[in-house]
Amino acid sequence: MKISEFCWEDIAPVFAILATENNGAWTYEQLEHSLKLENVICYVAKNDDKVLGFVLLEETPYDFDILEIVVDENLRGRGIGTMLMKRVVDYAKLTHKEKATLEVASDNKNAIMFYEKFGFSQIGMRKNYYKNGNDALVFQKTFI
């Protein structure tokens, strides 16, 4: 398995993985538009050209938001998410980013534990943020 920068041939499998996770929160067109932005970066985990997962970042000069980090639901627990997050941390250090921020549903306990494992801490909450009424927890990791 390797982590590489997004290329356009990856968009269909990336969207397929995203669609299973987000209950329609992203449309194909929104994903395509985001990927065309200069400040959006996407890393893809692949095995023999099969997309296993991805991470989508939106950066500013000093920090970035992790918009999505998603692994194919049939392949979770195999270290793919860990490899993607390590790439995020490496990118942050290489580009001298001060911090990374993300949102996670308050009932997504596995994701919360995953983020905490990488040193993210909860800094806030957005009540009733998701369509289903769930709260979003805001997490942040400082690099500098």
Question: Could you describe each region identified by the protein language model?
Answer:
Residues 2-74, 85-87, 91, 95, ...:
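Acetyl-CoA-dependent GNAT
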Residues 33, 107, 130:
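Positions that flank functional sites
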Residues 50, 69-86, 93-95, 99, ...:
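Conserved glycine-rich acetyl-CoA-binding loop
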Residues 60, 101, 138-140:
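Beta-strand secondary-structure signal
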Residues 103, 116, 121-137:
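Conserved catalytic-core motifs of GNAT/GCN5-like acyltransferases
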